[in-house]
């Protein structure tokens, strides 16, 4: 009877270090659960991804996708066409007076580098802006200072009351305390959180995420004039002052 004999080579223990080195060199970057380069921790000042920067610094107030937040939507092509890149950058870097928008630049104690602020501005305008759609739109002056430089007079509260009844009362109520489509625009708590410029911006571009029309659409075929915008903003702001005086007198 014939027997088959298998010859098994003796394992050389000296090969173990070589095998371990080979496995670590070849398979280390493919281990299950290992984070990708994008997922790895990095210092906050080295984050250069727009989505991460926006989520960490802006989404809490302006909404996860730039809309439906407590503050003005930034995902609004009309707003981004009205506001220059330099103005937007200044607001991010220096904050906005009389609002809860903080200064984010490192030079004033914020967390963001100049490069990160530039990335936020560029990201908003490239992702959410449609400047070419507004090439033929004659925008009102963005600020009261711009309005003065272009020939408009200062706002007048008495004229503003008439402007309010014409363009705004149908949504916000005859006295400004709220109506069928919009909330109060003279509530002291609201006015304490917004600047005059924020009021002006809201009048000009509306709130696209909440259905508030811009300066062209309150009355079909009749846009608000730059003077009317300044007047109604002055009327709105006068309620902030009146509320402050009433509070101090108590």
Give residue ranges: language-model regions.
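Long, charged N-terminal interaction/targeting segments
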Residues: 57, 71-73, 77-119
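Sequence contexts marking disulfide-bonded cysteines in secreted/extracellular proteins
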Residues: 29, 59-62, 172
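Gly/Gly-Pro-rich "capping" loops immediately C-terminal to redox-active cysteine motifs
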Residues: 40-47, 51, 63, 67-93, ...
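Sec-dependent signal peptide recognition
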Residues: 12-19
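N-terminal secretory signal peptides that target proteins for export/translocation
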Residues: 1-11
């Amino acid at each position: 009877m014939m027997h088959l004999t298998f010859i098994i080579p003796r394992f050389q223990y000296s090969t173990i270090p070589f095998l371990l080195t080979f496995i670590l060199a070849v398979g280390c970057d493919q281990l299950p659960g290992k984070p990708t380069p994008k997922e790895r921790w990095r210092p906050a000042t080295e984050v250069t991804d727009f989505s991460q920067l926006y989520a960490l610094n802006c989404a809490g107030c302006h909404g996860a996708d730039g809309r439906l937040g407590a503050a003005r939507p930034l995902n609004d092509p009309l707003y981004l066409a009205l506001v220059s890149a330099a103005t937007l950058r200044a607001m991010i870097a220096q904050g906005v007076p009389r609002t809860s928008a903080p200064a984010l630049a490192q030079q004033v104690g914020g967390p963001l580098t100049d490069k990160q602020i530039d990335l936020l501005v560029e990201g908003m305008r490239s992702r959410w802006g449609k400047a070419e759609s507004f090439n033929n739109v004659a925008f009102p002056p963005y600020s009261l200072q711009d309005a003065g430089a272009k020939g408009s007079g200062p706002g007048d509260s008495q004229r503003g009351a008439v402007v309010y009844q014409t363009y705004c009362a149908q949504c916000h109520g005859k006295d400004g305390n709220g109506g069928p489509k919009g909330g109060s625009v003279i509530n002291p708590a609201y006015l304490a959180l917004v600047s005059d410029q924020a009021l002006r911006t809201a009048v000009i571009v509306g709130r696209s995420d909440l259905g508030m029309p811009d300066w062209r659409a309150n009355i079909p075929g009749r846009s608000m004039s730059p003077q009317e915008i300044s007047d109604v903003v002055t009327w709105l702001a006068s309620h902030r002052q009146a509320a402050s005086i009433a509070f101090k007198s108590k």
